[in-house]
Amino acid sequence: MNRGALIKLVESRYVRTDLPEFRPGDTVRVSYKVKEGNRTRIQDFEGIVIRIRRNGFNTTFTVRKVSYGVGVERIFPLHSPLIQKIDIVQRGRARRAKLYFIRNLSDREIRRKLRADRKRIDKDRAAERAAKEEVQKAQEPEASQE
């Protein structure tokens, strides 16, 4: 077994598969575990994904938001156990892979450049409806057996 295969084998145990798929331009809410002193709490960070750096297990993504008129960017490791969950607030349609140019734009210009991606939103809603229907169908036979 060569070195690369061994590294992939070890890393595969820690890869997260429970997180949703997202792209640059999407607005996401990241729930991140923060340790303050002797207690831990969950902190939400909501903003636009401006970059995804794919590097296997070391994949990171950058989220940008404007808080009280100041732009804040945070880099999250995708496979970190400190990430509780990632919620996709809105799907965006970006024409670039790296959205560094939005650092210089106003909120109004950002909304115009990153329009909502209706096709991906509709696919997500259809998938959610199908999943709910499957759960309901699975529960109906159980109720009739009782």
From Swiss-Prot:
Residues 121-140 have a biased composition (Basic and acidic residues). It holds the Pfam family Ribosomal_L19. GO terms for molecular function: structural constituent of ribosome. Signal peptide: none annotated. GO terms for cellular component: cytosolic large ribosomal subunit. One of its GO terms (biological process) is translation. Residues 121-146 are annotated as: Disordered. Keywords: Ribonucleoprotein, Ribosomal protein. Coiled coil: none annotated. The keyword Ribosomal protein applies. The keyword Nucleus does not apply. InterPro entries: Ribosomal_bL19, Ribosomal_bL19_CS, Ribosomal_bL19_sf, Translation_prot_SH3-like_sf. It comes from the Bacteria. Belongs to the bacterial ribosomal protein bL19 family. This protein is located at the 30S-50S ribosomal subunit interface and may play a role in the structure and function of the aminoacyl-tRNA binding site. This is Large ribosomal subunit protein bL19. It comes from Thermus thermophilus (strain ATCC BAA-163 / DSM 7039 / HB27). The lineage of its organism: Bacteria, Thermotogati, Deinococcota, Deinococci, Thermales. The gene is rplS.
